[in-house]
UniProtKB/Swiss-Prot annotation:
Similarity comment text for this entry: Belongs to the SIMIBI class G3E GTPase family. UreG subfamily.
CDD domains named in the record: UreG
Highest rank taxon of the organism: Bacteria
Keywords: Chaperone, Cytoplasm, GTP-binding, Nickel insertion, Nucleotide-binding
Protein name, entry field: Urease accessory protein UreG
Quaternary assembly: Homodimer. UreD, UreF and UreG form a complex that acts as a GTP-hydrolysis-dependent molecular chaperone, activating the urease apoprotein by helping to assemble the nickel containing metallocenter of UreC. The UreE protein probably delivers the nickel.
InterPro entries on file: CobW/HypB/UreG_nucleotide-bd, P-loop_NTPase, UreG
Record gene name: ureG
Species in which this protein is naturally found: Shewanella halifaxensis (strain HAW-EB4)
Principal localisation: cytoplasm
Length: 207
């Protein structure tokens, strides 16, 4: 591989509302995958690089494997209509680490209608959390219905917010038939092995 050549990594878009646990998920995934694969992360924040700093402080990856993009304005635009800043960040990481296997692209906090441009993400993971209420899956939206994997996070909070995981499970099955979803708790690691299996299988990393 010459200096100008580099591997095209698998690009995984990670979206979801503010506070749903996207950054915590990325920390867990990076730590679980980094000894097996070459990993990097692009984070999106409107005016800061806070999520990039959080991942760096948590030592999820070396600092040169994390790029924080300051999107300004609407975070949806940076992952959909004009993904140029994110595409440039992915390319920069791929050039910097020529054998990258995976680049995670974390969106800024978005709503249920946000989607990743197919030019930017090969696979999409959408994260919602139980604290938003059991009605979230049935509200639908592209994040719920079209993502390759839906993660329903913070299941430990269900008793405190009056959310029924049974109802959420039924609604999710109805809203995304045939598409996978996983109930998770990042604090205990519940659901993490299933997420890793999905990434390796759907991303064809283990071929």
């Amino acid at each position: 591989m010459t200096e100008l050549e580099y591997k095209q990594p698998l690009r995984i878009g990670v979206g979801g509302p503010v506070g749903s646990g996207k950054t915590a998920l990325l920390e867990v995934l990076c730590k679980a995958l980094r000894n097996k694969y070459q990993i990097a992360v692009v984070t999106n924040d409107i005016y800061t690089q806070e999520d990039a700093k959080i991942l760096t402080r948590a030592e999820a990856l070396d600092a040169d494997r994390i790029i924080g993009v300051e999107t300004g304005g609407c975070p949806h635009t940076a992952i959909r209509e004009d993904a140029s800043m994110n595409l440039a960040a992915v390319e920069e990481l791929a050039k910097r680490h020529k054998n990258l296997d995976v680049v995670f692209v974390e969106s800024g906090g978005d709503n249920l209608s946000a989607t990743f441009s197919p030019e930017l993400a090969d696979l999409t993971i959408y994260v919602i959390d139980v604290a938003e209420g059991e009605k979230i899956p049935r509200k639908g939206g592209p994040g719920i219905t079209r993502s390759d994997l839906l993660i329903i996070n913070k299941i430990d909070l269900a008793p405190y917010v009056g959310a029924s995981l049974v109802v959420m499970d039924q609604d999710t099955k109805r809203m995304r038939p045939e598409k996978p979803y996983i109930f998770t708790n990042m604090k205990t690691g519940k659901g993490v092995p299933e997420i890793l299996t999905f990434i390796e299988t759907a991303g064809m990393l283990n071929i």
